[in-house]
Regions:
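Intrinsically disordered, low-complexity boundary segments flanking structured domains
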Residues: 57, 135, 278-281, 296
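Coiled-coil termination/hinge junctions
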Residues: 282-307
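ABC ATP-binding cassette signature C-motif
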Residues: 1-215, 301-489
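Extended, highly charged alpha-helical segments
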Residues: 77-80, 84-101, 179, 186-291
Length: 489
């Protein structure tokens, strides 16, 4: 049954934060809605979830007659069988109910009899979603479920969520959001607002509203400039006329004084119009998302073919992990490797980069090939950002400029990287690669945890500079916009 989650005058700041993360936010959310929650990295989506869960105290109030559950759920005993994890999380659910949910998600129910920790990350995501939806009367707060899902997994989870109701979903995947939400909750610079419809509808309206505000701002700036000049001219004329009455007769002085007074009134009226225009301009652009263009300096290479893979099969011990594959990567191509989780996409990238030697077949790289990489994981990022950048032998100023363009807060430059969110760490890896001149850019799931606006910046950059790339990425919209070819493993 429908009810409301009411957020009233919510204000919150992290300790030591100068500006509040949220200020006087008020929202009414229907518990039957399927809400997509979008916004820049670091703007407070996860923090908002924690406030709803009661983990953080904030000024204002949150009232709801439903309990909240959070995904990803922290499993206390990952070594237990999955069926036992189910019984702990959802003690009232029956095994047949979980089997039904798993079938909708394309998961074989034999996972129930395996230790939870042995499941792939994609399987764990699906199992936890199924378990949490079996908790009746709960409203789910789902935080970036797609990061460990391949393309097929994302489609299955989107179809699954479309059958459900009562959740807020954080995701930056445009196609995924379009497939499963009926409202968008946008976390802007100064506000949170809610719109009915899917992601594409919201985005179209958002861009239209931004363009309107920018046009209005330009008009008002021209008006302010014109009125400022007019006020100065009128004021100067008034002073000049007032000064000219000295040495005149009484009648002339009265006439001239009256004329000066009229001109002064006109000057004040112009000044009031200017002040109104300035105030109107201040109300605009508060939530406009400005993104500076990113730059890249790919190196030219004399060879037409940069990478040649011939009958390569990645091995793990004595086991071959995927059938032999052959491919060539030519100069100017942007090839996306596709396939189910665990089929060996990342392992093939590592083999091409010389970081995985356990394979059969042949990999040939063009002579003198310079490769820049974005790895999938971020756990190696620790300590000082400046020390990390210097260790990569890249220009510190250039790398930090790239980070600022990706909406990376200056205050983070002086904080240890262990304190960064996963999205912020991913931006460090991307900025490092963008600061490198290379013949070939190899990026392994670069968009995991990266916000929509940064994704669009990266798309535009790739379309502008046309680098040679080999990628693993499951964001369907990005692939359609930049890939010249897809290779299925």
């Amino acid at each position: 049954m429908m009810s409301l989650i009411r957020v009233n005058q919510l204000t919150f700041s992290h300790p030591g934060q100068l500006m509040p993360l949220f200020e006087n936010v008020s929202l009414d959310l229907d518990t039957d809605w399927r809400l997509g929650f979008v916004g820049r990295n670091g703007r407070g989506k996860t923090t908002f979830f924690k406030i709803l869960m009661g983990a953080y105290e904030a000024q204002g109030s949150v009232t709801a007659n439903v309990a909240f559950d959070y995904f990803p759920y922290e499993v206390a005993h990952p070594d237990w069988l999955t069926i036992d994890v189910l019984n702990e999380i959802t003690p009232m659910a029956e095994e047949w109910q979980l089997r039904r949910e798993l079938s909708l998600l394309g998961v074989n129910d034999d996972v129930l009899w395996r230790p939870f920790e042995t499941l792939s990350q994609g399987e764990q995501t699906k199992v936890l979603l199924a378990m949490l939806f079996l908790n009746e009367g709960r409203f789910l707060l789902i935080d970036e479920p797609t990061n460990h899902l391949d393309g097929q997994g994302r489609r299955l989870v989107a179809d699954y969520l479309r059958r459900k109701k009562g959740f807020i979903l954080v995701s930056h995947d445009r196609t995924f959001l379009d497939g499963c939400v009926d409202h968008i909750m946008a976390l802007n610079k100064t506000s949170i607002d809610v719109h009915q419809g899917d992601f594409s509808t919201w985005w179209e309206n958002f861009e239209r509203r931004q363009a309107f505000e920018e046009a209005q701002n330009e008009r008002l700036q021209r008006e302010v400039k014109s009125l400022t000049q007019a006020a100065r001219r009128t004021g100067a004329w008034s002073d000049k006329v007032e000064a000219s009455k000295f040495g005149q007769g009484p009648v002339d002085r009265g006439f001239i004084g009256h004329k000066a007074e009229k001109m002064m009134k006109r000057s004040k009226a112009i000044e009031k119009r200017r002040e109104r225009a300035v105030e109107e301009a201040k109300s605009l652009l508060q939530d406009v998302e400005k993104s500076e263009a990113l730059k890249l300096t790919p190196l030219p290479h004399w060879s037409e073919v940069l990478v040649r893979v011939e009958n390569v099969a990645i091995c793990h011990g004595d086991n071959v992990r995927l059938p032999p594959i052959s491919l060539t990567l030519s100069r100017g191509e942007r090839v996306v490797l596709d396939g189910a989780n665990g089929c060996g996409k990342s392992s093939l990238l590592h083999a091409i980069m010389g970081e995985h030697s356990d394979y059969t077949g042949t990999i040939r790289l063009a002579s003198g090939l310079v490769i820049s990489t974005v790895p999938q994981g971020t756990s190696h990022l620790k300590g000082s950002l400046r020390d990390y950048i210097e260790a990569q032998h890249i220009d510190t100023t250039l790398c930090m400029t790239m980070l600022r363009k990706l909406d990376f807060d200056r205050a983070l430059f002086e904080q240890p990287m262990e304190t960064y969110s996963t999205g912020q760490k991913k931006k460090v890896l991307l900025a490092k690669s963008l600061s490198e001149s290379a013949h070939l850019y190899i990026w392994d799931e670069p968009f995991n945890y990266i916000d929509l606006y940064s994704r669009l910046q990266l798309e535009e950059m790739i379309q502008t500079y046309q680098p040679t790339m080999l990628l693993v990425e499951h964001d369907q919209a990005f692939r359609e916009n930049i890939a010249t070819r897809t290779v299925n493993l």
